Amino acid sequence: MFYGEYQHTIDPKGRAIVPSKFREGLGEKFILTKGLDGCLFAYSSEEWTSLENKLKSLPFTDKDVRAFIRFFFSGATECEVDKQGRILIPQNLREYAALEKDTYIIGVSSRVEIWDKTAWEAYNSDENISADKIAEKMALLGI
């Protein structure tokens, strides 16, 4: 389980430090891919395999399923943590998430998300994503 929020920077070579608590759960090698809301998602190999199996069980004939699978898997890459606890974020993923220097690395249950600092702060200030509104929606779902 991943939780918490950490600020880090990406160096000029595109490397970012993965917080030690997240490295423990992700492992030395993990999958990084395009996420939703303009961020990147990181999954442990085990979680990725589980997610892959769930997605493979969806009806391939559904256009939206195919589109999501293409989006999700075409951006995926295996990352390896170096001795300094860093990963190299590929250029295409840095461009997708508009990652330049300042980032937030956050834990979200079964995955880690990497956000551009400005995008994360804008997301958190969005009135449609207030804690009260989210709580109301969760209550409707029985949570």
Swiss-Prot record:
**What is the annotated localization of this protein?**
Cytoplasm, Nucleoid
Which keywords describe this protein according to UniProt?
Cytoplasm, DNA-binding, Repeat, Transcription, Transcription regulation
Q: Which domain of life is it from?
A: Bacteria
Query: Which PROSITE patterns does this chain map to?
Result: SPOVT_ABRB
Alphabetical list of InterPro entries matching this protein: MraZ, MraZ_C, MraZ_dom, MraZ_N, MraZ_sf, SpoVT-AbrB_dom, SpoVT-AbrB_sf
Q: Which Pfam families match?
A: MraZ
The chain positions of domain SpoVT-AbrB read 5-47, 76-119
Q: Name one GO biological process term.
A: negative regulation of DNA-templated transcription initiation
**Which Gene3D superfamilies does the annotation name?**
Transcriptional regulator MraZ domain
Can you state the subunit structure given in the record?
A: Forms oligomers.
Which protein are we looking at?
Answer: Transcriptional regulator MraZ
Annotated gene? mraZ
